[in-house]
Amino acid sequence: MLQPQFRPLLAGTASFAQTVLGRTVARCYATKAATQSASSTSTSNTSKDAKAKIVTPYVRDAGMMRTYKPHTPGIRHLKRPINDHLWKGRPYLPLTFPKKGQSKGGRNHSGRVTVRHRGGGHKRRIRMVDFERWIPGPHTVLRIEYDPGRSAHIALVKEEATGRKSYIVAADGMRAGDVVQSYRSGLPQDLLDSMGGVVDPGILAARTCWRGNCLPVSMIPVGTQIYCVGSRPDGKAVFCRSAGTYATIISKEEETREDGTKVMTGKFVNVRLQSGEIRRVSKDACATVGIASNIMHHYRQLGKAGRSRWLNIRPTVRGLAMNANDHPHGGGRGKSKGNRHPVSPWGTPAKGGYKTRRKSNVNKWVVTPRVRNMGVRRNKKTT
């Protein structure tokens, strides 16, 4: 049996682990208020200075990777994020359907290969994830599940009013028992009554902008990290859906009234993606507060080629090693591609392509494009 070894990524020692892991942290995720008992708040502080309180750091299982003793060569370099909170059983079958047919091998309806290096993986069931979240009201998180079709984890939520279940992309830190809501269809009447009929942006943000809640972008304060961001008022989430991704709201078109309250006057909100690109999205587009779950996904190491095959990933063969009828670099005796510049399998130059694109082909929704090729590539908006 594999014996896991826990190695914190933080540069800590045994004393640091005893200090951090030995304490209990009161969890408060999403919109569920956590009650802390008096016994848990009373700590055994023997310091003479009673006013000096030690702040307990936030401990996350996702901040560690799991390694194994190398009983076999395939697990010597294997590293996995520690996600012991995931559901161990099968998915909710009414929200899934099997993936089968030629599409699993990267083929289209006519049988031609449209996506290379795919095929032969483990059988899967596609999870139908709700990226729109139009249904209002509180939803209870039943469990956090692994989804083979995406890098982020998904959460099975149940609507408290009707008992309807659905899948959503889980936020980092979301756990079973949390309560999330969607305010995309409008504010509920009980929330307006509790605020006295006056909608103050600051109080409204404090009542609604909690982790896992879906809101229009105009209701989220500047500087908030969001994921599953939409671009159109009636569209679904299209940005920041992978594991560990998020966007940041950087500016709005607002004006300040005489009483000090801010009112949004423009139609768009500027958000900054992790690539550095700043985009304009509609103020009524959807966004979820938080960061997409499974933030340690990019630190994983598969350890062997067989795990890539399990994940439906086929080998990538060099064009130089192919035959002449399979690739422009193929053929010849030995490693010889001739005196030709490197090209793709379809003959397009591999380093830059054909420089025939018009400068007028500019995306009007991009305010500041991302830096490409370490700043060497020219910007179409400035040239």
Curated annotation (Swiss-Prot):
InterPro entries listed in its UniProt record: NA-bd_OB-fold, Rib_uL2_dom2, Ribosomal_uL2, Ribosomal_uL2_bac/org-type, Ribosomal_uL2_C, Ribosomal_uL2_dom3, Ribosomal_uL2_RNA-bd_dom, Translation_prot_SH3-like_sf
Q: Which GO terms describe its molecular function?
A: RNA binding; structural constituent of ribosome; transferase activity
Print the keywords alphabetically: Mitochondrion, Ribonucleoprotein, Ribosomal protein
- Ranges where the record places region Disordered: 97-122, 322-357
* One Gene Ontology term from the biological process aspect of the record: mitochondrial translation
Q: What is its main location?
A: mitochondrion
Bias (Basic residues) occurs at 106-122, 330-340
Pfam families from the UniProt entry: Ribosomal_L2, Ribosomal_L2_C
Looking at the UniProt record for this protein, which Gene Ontology cellular component terms does it annotate, in alphabetical order? mitochondrial large ribosomal subunit
Task: Tell me where it resides.
Answer: Mitochondrion
Function as written in the Swiss-Prot or TrEMBL entry: Component of the mitochondrial ribosome (mitoribosome), a dedicated translation machinery responsible for the synthesis of mitochondrial genome-encoded proteins, including at least some of the essential transmembrane subunits of the mitochondrial respiratory chain. The mitoribosomes are attached to the mitochondrial inner membrane and translation products are cotranslationally integrated into the membrane.
Matching entries from NCBIfam families are given as: rplB_bact
The entry assigns this protein to a family as follows:
Belongs to the universal ribosomal protein uL2 family.
Q: Could you give the subunit structure recorded for this chain?
A: Component of the mitochondrial large ribosomal subunit (mt-LSU). Mature N.crassa 74S mitochondrial ribosomes consist of a small (37S) and a large (54S) subunit. The 37S small subunit contains a 16S ribosomal RNA (16S mt-rRNA) and 32 different proteins. The 54S large subunit contains a 23S rRNA (23S mt-rRNA) and 42 different proteins.
> What is the protein name stated in its UniProt record?
Large ribosomal subunit protein uL2m
